[in-house]
Design a protein with these regions (language model features):
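Surface-exposed, charged secondary-structure patches
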Residues: 101-154
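A short gly/proline-enriched turn/hairpin at secondary-structure junctions
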Residues: 81-95
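Short, low-complexity N-terminal intrinsically disordered segments enriched in polar/charged residues
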Residues: 36-80, 102, 118
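Beta-strand elements of well-folded, non-transmembrane domains
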Residues: 136-142, 161-163, 178
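Flexible low-complexity loop/turn motifs enriched in small/helix-breaking residues
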Residues: 55-58, 71-77, 81-83, 109, ...
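N-terminal secretory signal peptides that target proteins for export/translocation
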Residues: 1-15
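Low-complexity, intrinsically disordered terminal/linker segments enriched in charged
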Residues: 155, 162-191
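Bacterial N-terminal signal peptides
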Residues: 19-32
Length: 191
């Protein structure tokens, strides 16, 4: 194991325990108190960052804009953050538009958390992809029951972004779509 690999492994191990506890605590408190939607996007202390600060700022800005668009129930604002060739396990932009539209019809005060533990750039130039390893959740108040409902959650999921029109946009997943997901996993379609 090289020094770089060992460092990355150690960073993930330390982060995993703390972030797991913190994420569970935040989600539990959020669900238990029924508070209004609130979004947090945070770069974990000790996160593995393999890009320059300008790129980190641009990536964080994408998720801050997503948080704001969700809070405002701004469907066009959310869609503007997705790449034109978005593809996540076969879901395209039209599918994501429908999912978010349905969520806004069923829930109010949507909010969530994103804890980033790694930001890495793969490739270069127009083929560059940013991989953001993230743990988080999304919840909302049901318009039917007025109860806070967990909508989506993920642990060490990877958000993929591509440079399009000079800005980073959420692009889905990279490579082949697995025919069957591993036991205990589910696709994370919302980002």
């Amino acid at each position: 194991m090289t020094g770089l690999t060992r460092g990355i492994t150690m960073a993930q191990s330390k982060w995993s325990w703390f972030s797991s506890w913190l994420c569970v605590a935040v989600v539990t408190l959020n669900l238990a108190t029924g508070t209004t939607g609130h979004a947090n996007t945070l770069l974990q202390t000790g996160a593995v960052v393999e890009v320059d600060q300008a790129t980190v700022n641009q990536i964080m800005d994408v998720f801050y804009k997503a948080d704001a668009a969700i809070a405002e129930e701004n469907l066009e604002g959310i869609m503007a953050l997705h790449a034109t060739r978005y593809n996540y396990h076969g879901l395209k932009r039209a599918d994501i538009r429908r999912i978010w539209s349905d969520l806004f019809k069923e829930y109010r005060d949507l909010g969530g958390v994103h804890f980033f533990s790694k930001i890495a750039k793969v490739g270069s130039g127009s083929n560059a992809i940013i991989e953001v390893t993230c743990t988080g959740s999304l919840s909302g108040l049901s318009k039917t029951s007025s109860l806070r409902v967990p909508i989506d959650s993920w642990y060490l999921g990877v958000h993929y972004l591509t440079l399009e029109g000079g800005v980073w946009r959420i692009s889905g997943n990279v490579g082949e779509t697995p025919r069957v997901l591993p036991f205990g996993t589910a696709p994370h379609p919302l980002f």
